[in-house]
Amino acid sequence: MTDTRKSPEPGVKLRAADKVARIPVKIAPTEKPLRKPAWIRARTHGSPEVQRLKRVLREQRLHTVCEEASCPNLGECFGHGTATFMIMGDICTRRCPFCDVAHGRPEPLDAEEPENLARTIAAMGLRYVVITSVDRDDLRDGGARHFVDCIRTTRAHSPDIRIEILVPDFRGRMDVALAILNEAPPDVFNHNLETVPRLYREARPGSDYDWSLDLIQRFKETHPQVPTKSGLMLGLGEEMHEVEAVMRDLRDHGCDMLTLGQYLQPSLHHLPVKRYVTPEEFDRLAEIGYAMGFSQVASGPMVRSSYHADQQAQKVIPEG
């Protein structure tokens, strides 16, 4: 039967059931979610500092992945005056069923965003910032030029800042994207594999495991002095031997830093949590990671790719 549903108008956000309606592996709403164990905790989001930072972001028309992806650490990070900025809008062209960012047809890029971002970062007095983005498959360069504009403008306003970028996979656009990023390389290059290859069709429709590994390797070959980073979420049904295999693949492709955290289901329409990985298992994976040669491993139930990113980078980036 032909699917006659129309694509949403630009700017219309699809979430939950609407977002995952057309992915290859269908997801039935979760009826009985697993009970969260005692080690899964997150602070509330109602502190004055959290509310102040949210106001600043709205005034500057900026977005954070902390809010859009419903990160459980939002209260802690915002409470310390730090955030991971999400550029190029808050609508993603992908439909990954683990992610709470909305799907749809994005609006055109905001030409004022690099300046607004740079001024906000300078006003906050940040010394380390993470800049990430939604997937923009509608752009010929995947958004690489906008990343470079944001990096350059931020450095112009804050010359001593360290910038980590958490990039999409630039599907079908790797050559042009990497060529553009060469103009203003970040201080840390991060691209998340998210899960083991067996679960890609279900968890990362539209993405390719080997493509993502190649992206990390090619950036590292061009910029050997820039630390590379990737992350996995656990609890989607992967086996530990598969996780270790991915870790080995990352090392073989030049990845220096690793984050491992527990997947938490954003809504009943997202992928269910199959298992809560214990803190002891996360500690063991960290030991394995260091034995493999990773220079920095952050592994724990509440760890996220950008969580305490400044502290993760301290051991890797030499003081300038």
UniProtKB/Swiss-Prot annotation:
Pfam families in UniProt: Radical_SAM
Pathway where it operates: Protein modification; protein lipoylation via endogenous pathway; protein N(6)-(lipoyl)lysine from octanoyl-[acyl-carrier-protein]: step 2/2
Binding, [4Fe-4S] cluster 2: 92, 96, 99
UniProt keyword Aminoacyl-tRNA synthetase, yes or no: no
InterPro entries: Aldolase_TIM, Elp3/MiaA/NifB-like_rSAM, Lipoyl_synth, rSAM
GO molecular function: 4 iron, 4 sulfur cluster binding; lipoate synthase activity; metal ion binding
Binding site for [4Fe-4S] cluster 1: 66, 71, 77, 306
Alphabetical keyword list: 4Fe-4S, Cytoplasm, Iron, Iron-sulfur, Metal-binding, S-adenosyl-L-methionine, Transferase
Classification via HAMAP family: Lipoyl_synth (MF_00206)
Family per record: Belongs to the radical SAM superfamily. Lipoyl synthase family.
Record's protein name: Lipoyl synthase
